[in-house]
Swiss-Prot record:
One of its GO terms (biological process) is response to antibiotic. Keywords: Antibiotic resistance. InterPro entries: MarB. Pfam families: MarB. It comes from Salmonella typhimurium (strain LT2 / SGSC1412 / ATCC 700720). This is Multiple antibiotic resistance protein MarB. It comes from the Bacteria.
């Protein structure tokens, strides 16, 4: 019993630390399925293919590459 008294404050400190860590001060935001995310008006669109469909990337890079479709 005498050995438990020195360890008791440490155990209480650890247990209270776990209790405080699980509590949040901010309310939890609920995800809503009815919300639509829209891009900002000033943002340019993300174009994954900036070169036209009929052209290839070698034209933009200046590398001589011959595509069979253009022959």
């Amino acid at each position: 019993m005498k050995m438990l008294f020195p360890a008791l404050p440490g155990l209480l400190l650890i247990a209270s630390g776990y209790g405080i860590a699980e509590q949040t001060l901010l309310p939890v935001a609920q995800n809503s399925r009815d919300v639509m995310l829209l891009p900002c008006v000033g943002d340019p669109p993300n174009d994954l293919h900036p070169v036209s469909v009929n052209s290839d990337k070698s034209d933009e890079l200046g590398v001589p590459y011959y595509n069979d479709q253009h022959l």
